Amino acid sequence: AWSGVWSGTLDIYGGKGKVQSVGMEIEILKIDTSTQGRYTFSLIYGGRDKDYRPYELVPVDASKGLWRVDEKNTIVMESYLYGPKLLCWFVVEGSRILCSYEKTDDRTLIFEVVSGRETPVSVTGNTKTDKEDISEVKTFPVSVFQRAVLKRK
């Protein structure tokens, strides 16, 4: 089960290595009053008094792995539970962001974020040779990578 309070350190990396570390918790708790199977999905950075994000995790079609993260401020993002990973991929203010939450065992949850500008850094391919049509490939920059290994409290 994913339910529980998960705690650890979030490490933030750039091209030159680790740039910052901050304490992090994720609270995933069933909402007692919910008949829809909703859960709290709170992200806490540096303590509840510093950066507390009281989101909710809402099932849409759990049999197909479709959920939504409701930020409770009109932002609602589709998320996908595929195998051991919950994935959410979105664009905000020109940055493309992929968040993943991976339950590796009953006591460990790995949280990762990859982000970078939505503008490609290169476009290659898009040509023909004697033997094949080469598809166009756009490569996007990665500016920040974040990772936390969280343990169940």
Predicted regions and their residues:
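N-terminal helix-cap/turn-to-beta initiation motif at the start of protein domains
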Residues: 1-5, 32, 100-104
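A short hydrophobic beta-strand element
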Residues: 4-8, 37-39, 107-113
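Short, solvent-exposed loop/hinge segments that bridge or flank secondary-structure elements
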Residues: 7-38, 136-153
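Short beta-strand segments enriched in hydrophobic/aromatic residues
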Residues: 10-12, 45, 115
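Central antiparallel beta-sheet cores of small beta-barrel/beta-sandwich binding domains
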Residues: 16-99
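Beta-sheet ligand-binding and adhesion/scaffold domains
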Residues: 64-153
